[in-house]
Amino acid sequence: MLCAFIFYASLNKKFINLGSKLTLANFSVLFIACAYLSFQFLQDNFAFIYVFENSSNLLPTYYKFSAFWSAHEGSFLLMILLLSGCMVLNNWFFWEEKWMPISNATAAFILFFYLLFQIFTSNPFLTFDIEPNNGTDLNPLLQDPLLAIHPPVLFTGYVLYAITFSLVIAGMFRGFGKELFKNLKFWAGISWFTLTLAILLGSIWAYYELGWGGYWFWDPVENIVLLPWLAGTAFTHSLIYSRNKILLSWMVFLGISTFLLSILGSFIVRSGILNSVHSFASDPSRGVFLLSLFALFAFSSLGLFFSKSVLLKSNWPELMSKQYLLLLNNIVLLVILLIVFLGTLYPIVTEVFYEQKLSIGPDYFSSLITPLVFTLIGLFLAEQFLTSLKANKKKTLLLIGFVSSIFLILFITDLSPINLGLLFVLLVLVILLARALIELALNKDIKILHKVLGHLSVVLLTFAVLVNHQFSESVDVKLKPGDEVQFSGSTLKLDSINIEGKENFDTVVARFSVSEASNEKNLISEKRVYKIGGVITSETGISSSIIKDYHIVLGDRYQDGSWSIRFSINYGIMMIWISSIILLLSMLYGTIRRHGY
C-alpha cells in the first residue's frame, strides 16, 4: 500500500497504472484473508484466538458467519477490505479523471496506516499452541439478526466518508471542477445514507433488545456515531452551493472534520475509556495507536487546508438568501455537534485528569438540543417563505403575518413547553405539506420530491419523538400465570409460563395478552440463559401499531411463583421508524438522480 501511495502521488501515468494494479492486488489479498477467517468460524477452529473468543460449537451457523465482524479485530479487517474495495471502484470508474490519482493516493495513505494498526494491535489470525475443545461463545447481545448486519453498515458509512475525504483532498490539489463536485455529492450522499441507516438499525435494536423501552439513550457510543453524522449532514448541505464558489472553504473544512470525527470515534470506543452498553471490546494500546493516527490525519489535512486557504477563498452568501439560510442551518448543526461532543468527552477528561467519575444524563442533551432542533425546523419554514417571497411578495407577507399571529397566540397561551413544541411542529408540518402539494400540483415536477420529503420527514420525526416523550408511560407489576392488571385503559394478562430448550440457550417463555376495548394483542417475552457462560438476557415482547406500541419485559421470578414485569405503552414509535425510512429513501433517490442514474 505504501508503494501504491507513492505511485499515485507521482502523477506519472505509468506509475499510476502500476499503483492501480497494486490496489487490486491488495484488495484480492484482503478478500482472501476475510474469506479464510470466515471459514475458520464455520469450521469451529478454536485454535484461532479470535474464533475462540467469539464463537462456540453451539452457536447457530448464521451467527458464526456474522461473528467474523462481532469484535474489534474482525470488524477492523472488514473496514479495511471495504476501503480497499472503494479504491478499486475509484480506479474502475474514474480512471481518466485528473483528480483520481490524488484521491487514491490519499486513500492508500489511510489504508497503509490502517493495515499497520491491524497487524500490530489487532491481528485476528493469532493462534493457541494447543487448540481448546470449545469457544467462549459470541456475546449474547450480538446473537440477533439486526446486530448481524448493523456493524457492516456502520463500517461502510465510516469508510465511505474516508473516500469523500480523499476527494476533498484531491480537490485542494487539482481544483474543484464540475465532475469532482458531481462525484463528491454522490459519495457524500451514499455515505450519509449508509451512516443514517446504521444509526436507525442500532436504534431499532436498542428498542427491542436492551429492555429499557427506548430507542435512544444518549449512550456514549451512540453519541460518538452521531458526531460524524452531524458533521456529514452539514457537509452534504454545504455541497449544494459550493460549486458556485459560495462557502467552498466551509465545505472543505466540513469534509475533513467528518472524516476526523469518525477516526476520533474509533479511538474512543476502542481505547476502553468508555463505559457503554455497546462496548464489547477494548484495549488501551489500540487507543494510543488510533489517537496517534487521528493526530497524524488531523495535522496533515488541516495543515493542507490552511496552506490552500487562498485557493479556497469563496464568496459570502447574500443576507437572507437561500445560501445564507443554508449557512445558518450548518451553524445550528455544528452547535448541536459541539453540545454532544462536550457532553460525551467531558466525563472522560474529568476522569483522566482529575480522577473523578462524572456522568452526564439524557436531560443535559435533551434540554440543550431540543430548542436547536426547533430552530432547524424554523429554518425549513423560512426557506419556504423565502421562495414564495420572490414570486409574490404581497401574498407572502400576508401569509407570514398570519402564521406569526398563530405562533404568537400559541406562545401566550398557558401551555407546557412540550405541548407548545408539539403544536409548533405540527403547524410547521401542515405548512410544509401544503406547500409541497401546491408546488407539485402547479409545477408537476417530481424532481423536487426528494427535497420535500426529506424536510417533511425530519419534521415528522421530531413530532413523533415529542409525542413519544409526552405520552408514553410504563408500570412495574407482579403477576402469576392467569393474573391480569389494568393500566392506562388496557388490560395485561399473563397467560402462561413455559421453559423451552434451544440450540445454545434455555429460555423461560412468557405469553401475554393485552386487550383494549374489543382489540386483543398476543405478545411473547423471554428470559434466556445461555449454555456457555451462563449469561442471562431478556427478550422483549412488542406489538406495534401506527399510534402506539405495547412493550413487555419479563423480569425475575419471586418465591411465591409470581414474576416481575415491566409493561410500557409507547406512543409514536412506528412514526419514528417510518419518518426515518422516508428520510433515507428521499436521500437515496436524490443522490442517484443527481448522478444521472
Give short role names for the model-derived ranges.
Residues 1-14, 18, 25-32, 36, ...:
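Contiguous transmembrane helix-bundle modules in multi-pass membrane proteins
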Residues 13-30, 89-111, 173-193, 241-256, ...:
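Membrane-interfacial loop-to-helix junctions in multi-pass inner-membrane proteins
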Residues 152, 159-169, 180-237, 259-263, ...:
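Extended, hydrophobic alpha-helical segments in both membrane/secreted and soluble proteins
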Residues 459-596:
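Accessory, solvent-exposed terminal regions and/or long lumenal/extracellular loops of proteins
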